[in-house]
């Protein structure tokens, strides 16, 4: 079956955070990381059947849910997950916060690689910890890791956790196995637990390969915690569901207590159903989605090369979040964000949301029907008329 990702569906008036937060209907929102596609039809059908039942009481997590999760990762990624390693939770962000709470005490340090997903910052701060950054190195329109800096920062005995983003948001990198091995070896050497946010793991372009951090070796498995969810890949973030994978029994017990302390383990019946259907029946839909997203990126890349050479974009290996270099404009990212909204009707994320290393960059969500990138024309017209 061929799925139609070109279909335009209005999300206005649905209390969409992405669309209904705009001050004007003339603003095109390409900021928040969700997609403007309907989810897989099999998921819609399963949810419709559940709604027709009409009773939405307290729900348990069935055996079939765990079988769907473990089956998917074994089949698609070659990662064998024991059921007992899985901790159900209501989202990756609550999961990360609970894991930090479980593995640190106030005053400890947590390391990140900026620019990085901004919710990492609040999760660290809300648990009374100090953030330490080992910035990524930007060159030739891509990002790499400064291993010497990472080694130096993790050697601080106050650093207890490293938050890894794999694939990386907003850099668009899908970390190679050898890169993850070097990260893991450094962290194990300094007794730092790697907490890997792998929510974008299904959104990897065919030329690249996602490696689950905990799958690399038994040693890595027991020194890491992985957070996963079908929400990004299948566009079901509103159903609030995720899983923590932790093989180490001692860490898992601490995390389980923190999850319950934070009260983020209540079961959403629709999330449970959607996850099972996504993993059991959604693979072909996902494969077609990935091809469509890559075609969107190639379209955007070519458009920018031809019409907006002053706006180079990073090489996108995975996710649907393009990182645009706007340094040549000499405008602060937050000012540029506001000017694009006011003058071009285009809402992007200021790079500084993701750390000071994001200065001069903008993040652009391209998970939309290909007819939507009239937004590129918005940007071109703005650049031409206003000279930015």
What annotation goes with each model-predicted range?
Residues 2-91, 98, 278-281:
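N-terminal small-domain helix-loop-helix segment of the aminotransferase-like
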Residues 56-185, 202-203, 210-215, 219, ...:
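Conserved core of the PLP fold type I
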Residues 377-384:
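Conserved small/polar residues in nucleotide/adenosyl-binding loops
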Residues 276, 293-301, 313-326, 358:
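Conserved glycine-rich beta-strand-loop-beta hairpin in the small C-terminal domain of fold type I
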Residues 127, 189-190, 220, 344:
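Helix C-cap/helix->beta junction micro-motif
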Residues 45, 218, 222-294, 298-302:
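Conserved core segment of the aminotransferase class I/II
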Residues 311-312, 324-363:
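Conserved C-terminal alpha-helix-loop-beta "cap" of PLP-dependent enzymes
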């Amino acid at each position: 079956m061929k799925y139609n990702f070109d279909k335009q569906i209005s999300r206005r008036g649905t209390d969409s955070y992405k669309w209904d937060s705009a001050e004007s209907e003339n603003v095109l929102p390409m900021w928040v990381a969700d997609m403007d596609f309907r989810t897989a039809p099999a998921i819609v059908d399963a949810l419709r059947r559940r709604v027709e039942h009409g009773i939405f009481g307290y729900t348990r997590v069935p055996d079939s849910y765990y079988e769907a999760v473990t089956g998917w990762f074994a089949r698609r990624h070659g990662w064998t997950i024991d059921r007992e390693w899985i901790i159900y939770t209501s989202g990756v962000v609550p999961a990360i916060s609970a894991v930090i709470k479980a593995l640190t005490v106030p005053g400890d340090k947590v390391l990140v690689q900026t620019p990085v997903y901004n919710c990492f910052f609040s999760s660290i701060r809300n648990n009374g910890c100090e953030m330490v950054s080992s910035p990524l190195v930007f060159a030739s329109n891509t990002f790499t890791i400064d291993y010497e800096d990472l080694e130096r920062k993790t050697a601080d005995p106050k650093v207890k956790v490293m938050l890894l983003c794999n694939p990386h948001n907003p850099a668009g990198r899908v970390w190679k196995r050898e890169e993850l091995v070097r990260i893991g070896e450094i962290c194990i050497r300094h007794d730092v637990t790697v907490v890997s946010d792998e929510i974008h793991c299904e959104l990897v372009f065919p030329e690249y390969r996602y490696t689950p951090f905990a799958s690399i070796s038994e040693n890595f498995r027991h020194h890491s915690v992985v957070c996963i969810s079908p929400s990004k890949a299948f566009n079901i973030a509103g159903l609030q569901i995720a899983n923590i994978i932790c093989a180490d029994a001692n860490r898992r017990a601490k995390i389980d207590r923190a999850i319950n302390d934070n009260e983020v383990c209540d079961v959403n019946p629709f999330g449970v159903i959607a996850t099972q259907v996504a993993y059991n029946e959604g693979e072909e839909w996902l494969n077609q989605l990935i091809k469509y997203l890559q075609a969107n990126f190639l379209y955007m890349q070519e458009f920018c090369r031809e019409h907006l050479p002053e706006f180079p974009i990073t090489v996108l290996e995975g996710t649907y979040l393009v990182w645009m270099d706007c340094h040549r404009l000499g405008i602060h990212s937050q000012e540029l964000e506001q000017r694009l909204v006011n003058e071009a009707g285009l809402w992007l994320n200021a790079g500084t949301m993701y750390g000071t290393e994001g200065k001069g960059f903008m993040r652009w969500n391209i998970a939309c029907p290909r007819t939507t990138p009239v937004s590129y024309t918005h940007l071109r017209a703005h650049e031409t008329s206003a000279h930015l």
